[in-house]
Curated annotation (Swiss-Prot):
GO CC terms in record: cytoplasm; ribonuclease H2 complex
Entry's family note: Belongs to the RNase HII family.
GO terms for biological process, alphabetical: DNA replication, removal of RNA primer; mismatch repair
Protein name per Swiss-Prot or TrEMBL: Ribonuclease HII
Disulphide-bonded residues: none
Protein's cellular compartments: Cytoplasm
Cofactor mode of binding and number, as noted: Manganese or magnesium. Binds 1 divalent metal ion per monomer in the absence of substrate. May bind a second metal ion after substrate binding.
Keywords: Cytoplasm, Endonuclease, Hydrolase, Manganese, Metal-binding, Nuclease
Residue ranges crossing the lipid bilayer per the database entry: none
Co-factor(s): Mn(2+); Mg(2+)
């Protein structure tokens, strides 16, 4: 029986994105799935979680893979169809804002990771998650701090989640005009705060986030910066899922 944890390979940042996965494959623990999320800090829109399995060999077509936050929009859009083409399996899960409110963002994140892994058409032998331990998986797993910059399968999942969520937020602009979702993607900006104060929260906003909840409670928007949307105040379920072959391009 293979070991539950990867061999104690020394992984240096300069080693490249495939080093950890390669060690797992050599130990007989493949296929290796990476899982990552996008949208934890947004106060509107879904939390999106992706799982992705890449083959054991490095592909030149995916050489530009990196943490999706380090890639610009054009780079992510170029990689998105390539990942879908060359991945052995992938699965993208959308956790709606109502479920984030009901469960709390961390619990919703972990549940989303479980769903994403469970939805893969190829059962992984090992799962690498970005930063968080994912209890309840039926296979061994390892949280990797900064995983989207340390493992190719996590980086691929990061790009799938980011592009899927960004496209959804752009489409959401037509359904909820005036909030600027196409620009800020549901994250907190001055323009978003001004729209919230003017229009009030939409059905896509997370009422458990303090800056949204305060508008409901007393009509006063919270002052905040550009990157977060305030802390959660409380710990509902329709689940959207992107399977292989869905979402154009």
């Amino acid at each position: 029986m293979p070991a539950a944890w990867p061999p104690r390979t020394v992984i240096r940042k300069s080693s490249g994105l495939r080093t950890l996965e390669s060690a797992l494959y050599r130990a007989g623990l493949g296929p290796v799935a990476g899982v990552d999320e996008v949208g934890r800090g947004a106060c509107a829109g879904p939390l999106v979680v992706a799982a992705c399995v890449l083959g054991p060999n490095r592909l030149e077509s995916l050489a530009a893979l990196d943490d999706s936050k380090k890639l610009n929009e054009n780079e992510r859009e170029r990689l998105f169809p390539l990942i879908r083409r060359y991945a052995l399996a992938y699965h993208v899960v959308f956790i709606p804002s109502q479920e984030v409110d009901r469960r709390g963002v961390h619990v919703a994140n972990i549940e989303g990771m479980r769903r994403a892994v469970a939805g893969l058409s190829l059962r992984p032998g090992y799962v690498l998650s970005d930063g968080f331990r994912v209890p309840g998986l039926p296979m061994p797993s390892l949280p990797v701090v900064g995983g989207d910059a340390a493992a190719a399968c996590i980086a691929a999942a990061s790009v799938l989640a980011k592009v899927s969520r960004d496209r959804l937020m752009v489409a959401m602009e037509d359904e909820h005009p005036g909030y600027g979702f196409a620009e800020h993607k549901g994250y907190s900006t001055r323009a978003h705060s001004a729209a919230l104060a003017r229009l009030g929260p939409s059905s896509q906003h997370r009422y458990s986030f303090i800056n949204v909840r305060r508008l409901v409670m007393d009509g006063e928007p919270e002052e905040h910066g550009e990157v977060g949307c305030g802390k959660m105040l409380v710990d509902m379920p329709v689940d959207g899922v992107l399977h292989e072959g869905q979402l154009s391009r």
